[in-house]
């Protein structure tokens, strides 16, 4: 068990459970809010085939998460979609989480890669849909699945 003091002076206890994953304790409750998220480009265009766009996409998602207190456990940017596991604040619902990540990352991408406007003149980089589920105790299996995405897509 580890004890850390957070920025507001409250005592935050971190407890190791299930495969070494750290869970947070706030007062009388213990838990985490790990989410496996998949978001795809609009029309599944392979926009991240370009190494430049792929790098900017990674940086834009990292910045969006940092600004909103969302911790990225793993992030894999594929040619037409992104897989990630994030640990978000426990009060944040899935729809808000996706809105923050897709909205700010899209806004950043259109400013640093101006040529994206040729493909997406309406300013929608991401598809309207998404996949988001709680990871729970399957963290190691989900992490390995995301880690092996290049190999998974190479065999298809």
What are these regions, as identified by a protein language model?
Residues 1-156:
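Charge-rich, low-complexity N-terminal segments
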């Amino acid at each position: 068990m580890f004890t850390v003091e957070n920025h507001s002076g409250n005592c935050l206890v971190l407890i190791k459970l299930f495969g070494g994953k750290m869970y947070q304790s706030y007062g009388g409750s213990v838990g985490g809010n790990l989410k496996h998220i998949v978001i795809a480009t609009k029309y599944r265009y392979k926009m991240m085939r370009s190494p430049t766009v792929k790098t900017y996409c990674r940086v834009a998602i990292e910045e969006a998460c940092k600004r909103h207190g969302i911790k990225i456990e793993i992030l894999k940017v594929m040619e037409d979609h992104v897989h990630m596991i994030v640990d978000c604040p426990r009060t944040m619902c899935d729809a808000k989480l996706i809105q923050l990540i897709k909205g700010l990352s899209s806004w950043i991408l259109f400013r640093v890669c101006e040529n994206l406007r040729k493909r997406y003149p309406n300013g929608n980089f991401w598809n309207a849909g998404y996949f988001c589920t709680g990871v729970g105790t399957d963290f190691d299996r989900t992490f390995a699945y995301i880690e092996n995405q290049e190999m998974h897509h190479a065999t298809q």
